[in-house]
């Protein structure tokens, strides 16, 4: 049986040798060129392949059509991936008749994603393992062929566990590969309900929070011990790394981060103390704990701190147009929680951002983007990242005011995009899930799904096509003139400050706000065309975290990307949303201050939205791009979002005024 192998790291070396030992013919091996900035403590697949006389390649993009064609010419019967760092396209996965199979360093479906070796230690697990699974479009989600468990000892650190996993992988492959070679390939579906997903870890994730339990801090030390970058803290401006530690139960009443003693070197955590066995000050040599205390000048009672503010480094300036809107005000809060961001904003009102107006890193001007073009151009030039969030995005306005939707959503925003091109500024643009229109795919893929809208005489599509056209213009500017951009597509984000009850009174709001108004005023909840349309509702906190990671843009992985941001697990019909909202309303402590429930009322969309409206039966996102580029996974259940949104609006109502 002829195999093509994608491999890297020690696991890659183990996999290549196991495939050879099982009697497969290896037609070619694809690997990665080593990164000079990375600590390459592991074996070299390219060297191994060269010594074995096997053709080996390290393309920048193995999914490029040229490489897909070359792999097809190799005519593999089977494909293996052993710690290859890039996802393989469906075109490659379909080249091998027997299938494509990946070795993953956890017991799937737990710990899908990046760095499972480190994450299991961070989380204090007592067991992990390796899994061979069939590769499908979604990372780590295919049927399981075989797995092998590995016990995690209390004294295991990242490197010792790595060696255990390599040994387990070799045993697993030696056992299953001969069977697969004979055509007998076991297949057990993964239980999605048991799946967990983790993103990549960065060196800065090793920063210790002394307010955490001692077990959490100790597990972090274990998880990133050498040859990984290490867990670290600061004494003043001096950074130091902790390479090994042990837990002590008694913090002697000291505040978290306080040095309890210097010989041995012990530091208080939330519920105990961490004894530092070995560590390193800056780029100095590794020494034992008491010597580290001397090097750092530590004494009992000293307080360790978070990294000092770097006055020499300019903060990242973010321009948010539409800063008072739903996304804008929540994003502002997230950015201001980080020391290295400064926010400049414009909007026609300030009610939602009044809590930030005195913040020293928030600069607001009340104005209209269609009027204050000079201010906007100046601040595009001044800032680093631009988010043009101004848009008319309420469905009833698409049929009421289609020309105004086009003028604001397309024409005014196009001018801002051109400023970004002119001054070479990065733009993070809010596309919309509406661009998929009546797409028939089970889940909407940013890079493959067709964008399908209705006829011209249905003006409800003016918003969708305005956004889609601007998406295409931005993409073209990126391709032809080097514009740095990311398009993000929110899928039904919900939470506090979504629209207002006053907007709902004139029909100019999103669904949940309109439903809450019906409950507050004791009017029937209107179910448009029966309310069977399904949407995937996403908590604003989940959405904003993803958007924040797009702005951070770690490793420039979001450049030139389109990213859906939604929660596929929170799919529900509008009727189901209304029922859940009613249940939460009846349980709310303020329920007694509002009228009785007036029931549900089914209405036709034409009578509600007017002539020219069409609805969409379902709208579910694929979030593979978000997982891959952001290391992001939504986590907040729909019920929690509904309850928090309802609570916000009920507490905003003047109860005394209602009673009078």
UniProtKB/Swiss-Prot annotation:
GO molecular function, one term: carboxy-lyase activity
Induction: Induced by BasR.
UniProt GO cellular component terms: membrane
Region of interest (Formyltransferase ArnAFT), residue spans: 1-304
GO term, biological process aspect, one: response to antibiotic
Keyword presence, Oxidoreductase: yes
Residues noted as binding (6R)-10-formyltetrahydrofolate in the record, renumbered to the chain: 114, 136-140
Site (Raises pKa of active site His): 140
Keywords, alphabetical: Antibiotic resistance, Lipid A biosynthesis, Lipid biosynthesis, Lipid metabolism, Lipopolysaccharide biosynthesis, Multifunctional enzyme, NAD, Oxidoreductase, Transferase
HAMAP family attached to this UniProt entry: ArnA
Oligomer status and interactors: Homohexamer, formed by a dimer of trimers.
Record's protein name: Bifunctional polymyxin resistance protein ArnA
Organism of provenance: Salmonella typhimurium (strain LT2 / SGSC1412 / ATCC 700720)
Name of the gene encoding the protein in the UniProt record: arnA
């Amino acid at each position: 049986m002829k195999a093509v192998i994608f491999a890297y790291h020690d696991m890659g070396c183990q996999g290549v040798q196991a495939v050879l030992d099982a009697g497969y013919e290896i037609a070619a091996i694809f690997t990665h060129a080593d990164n000079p900035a990375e600590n390459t403590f592991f074996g070299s697949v390219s060297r191994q392949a060269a010594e074995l006389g096997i053709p080996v390649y390290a393309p920048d993009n193995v999914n490029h059509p040229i490489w897909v064609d070359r792999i097809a010419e190799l005519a593999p019967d089977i494909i293996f991936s052993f710690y290859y760092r890039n996802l393989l396209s469906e075109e490659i996965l379909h080249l091998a008749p027997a299938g494509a199979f990946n070795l993953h360093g956890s017991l799937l479906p737990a710990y899908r994603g990046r760095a499972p070796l480190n994450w299991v230690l961070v989380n204090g697990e007592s067991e992990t393992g390796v899994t061979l699974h069939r590769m499908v479009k979604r990372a780590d989600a295919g049927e399981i062929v075989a797995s092998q468990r590995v016990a995690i000892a209390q004294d295991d650190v990242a490197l010792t566990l790595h060696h255990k996993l390599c040994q387990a992988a070799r045993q697993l492959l030696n056992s299953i590969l001969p069977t697969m070679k004979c055509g007998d390939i076991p297949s057990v579906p993964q239980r999605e309900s048991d799946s967990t997903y983790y993103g990549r870890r960065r060196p800065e994730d090793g920063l210790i929070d002394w307010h955490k339990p001692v077990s959490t801090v100790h597990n972090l030390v274990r998880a990133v011990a050498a040859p990984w970058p290490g867990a670290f803290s600061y004494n003043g401006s001096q950074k130091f790394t902790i390479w090994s530690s042990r837990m002590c139960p008694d913090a002697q009443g000291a505040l978290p981060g306080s040095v309890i003693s210097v010989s041995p070197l012990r530091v208080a955590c939330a519920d105990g103390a961490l004894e530092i066995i070995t560590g390193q000050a800056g780029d100095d040599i590794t020494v034992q704990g008491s010597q580290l205390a001397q090097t750092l000048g530590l004494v009992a009672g000293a307080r360790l701190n978070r990294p000092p503010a770097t006055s020499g480094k300019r903060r990242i300036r973010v321009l948010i147009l539409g800063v008072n809107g739903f996304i804008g005000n929540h994003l502002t809060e997230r950015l201001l929680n980080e020391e290295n961001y400064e926010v400049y904003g414009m909007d026609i009102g300030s009610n939602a951002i009044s809590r930030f107006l005195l913040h020293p890193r928030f600069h607001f001007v009340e104005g209209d983007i269609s009027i204050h073009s000079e201010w906007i151009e100046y601040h595009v030039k001044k800032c680093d990242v631009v988010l043009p969030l101004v848009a008319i995005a309420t469905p009833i306005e698409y049929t009421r005011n289609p020309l105004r939707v086009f003028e604001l959503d397309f024409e005014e925003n196009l001018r801002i995009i051109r400023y970004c091109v002119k001054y070479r500024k990065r733009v993070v643009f809010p596309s919309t899930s509406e661009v998929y229109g009546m797409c028939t795919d089970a889940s909407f893929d940013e890079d493959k799904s067709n964008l399908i809208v209705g006829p011209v005489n249905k003006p409800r599509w003016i918003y969708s096509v305005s956004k889609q056209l601007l998406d295409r213009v931005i993409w073209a500017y990126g391709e032809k003139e080097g514009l740095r951009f990311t398009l993000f597509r929110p899928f039904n984000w919900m939470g506090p400050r979504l629209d207002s009850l006053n907007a709902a009174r004139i029909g100019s709001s999103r669904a949940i706000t309109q439903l809450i108004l019906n409950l507050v005023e004791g009017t029937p909840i209107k179910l448009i065309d029966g309310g069977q349309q399904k949407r995937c509702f996403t908590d604003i906190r989940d959405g904003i975290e993803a958007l924040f990671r797009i702005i951070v843009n770690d490793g420039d992985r979001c450049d030139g990307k389109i990213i859906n941001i939604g929660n596929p697990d929170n799919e529900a019909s509008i009727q189901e949303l209304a029922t859940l909202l009613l249940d939460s309303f009846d349980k709310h402590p303020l329920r007694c201050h509002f009228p009785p429930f007036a029931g549900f009322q089914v209405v036709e969309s034409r009578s509600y939205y007017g002539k020219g409206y069409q609805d969409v039966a379902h709208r579910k996102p694929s979030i593979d791009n978000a997982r891959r580029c952001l290391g992001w996974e939504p986590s907040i259940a729909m019920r929690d979002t509904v309850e928090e949104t309802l609570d916000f609006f009920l507490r905003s109502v003047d109860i005394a005024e209602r009673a009078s």
